[in-house]
Amino acid sequence: MGFEVVDWTGGLAYSGDWNHIGWTVAASRRPISSSLLAFGGAKDPNTGITWGGVRATGVSLSASYDRGEANGVWADLSAHQITGKNVADNQRQRLMAGYYYKLINEDNRRLSVGLNTMLWHYQKDLSGYSLGQGGYYSPQQYLSLSLPVNYRQRTENWSWELGGSVSLSHSKTDSQRRYPLQGLIPDSLPDKFAVEDGSSSSGVGYTCGRSSNAVSVRTGRSAPASIFNRRRTIRRATR
């Protein structure tokens, strides 16, 4: 496909139930696709060194509780080692959890509200694109809280959904070397030992969207889904 770094990815998962709690444990090696550098790698024109192709290898445990009644909860815990070709090694831990309450809980109609939270931690900030960096978002602290609202309904021929959320988030990155793998950088480069300052930011955002699908009873064919999404984020950054 023309990528500079090509290797294997995959995963295994096993699911079960315990006291009405559904759970899944998984082990995987997955590509990080947040940039072309992270996903497929790049070649430095000055040194001829190839770097990038970042992969996350680790385990995750997810669980959920929903007996079809008004309340439901879910959680996901994961830990990964993040590596790449000529990219500094990194570690990632993530905890995500949520609660939802069904204000309307009928066979063909449902309205739910909830509270979701995410807590991420990366050992290093390797979000840059210089030699040795990974080109992926990797804050040392990331915390978000969101309040989702979702309504869905179906009839004999139609189904549609409306949803939206309001969220608060905060992130922090530590200072980092511009070139984290010093052995790759020639001594003649004037900024070989340069350091990028850390930063912190807080933000408020919202999402809203709708989707619908028309189904022909006589032919069994589905008309194309029409999806409209709108997103806006307001952020405040400090250094």
Question: Model segments located where?
Answer:
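Gram-negative and organellar
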Residues: 1-239
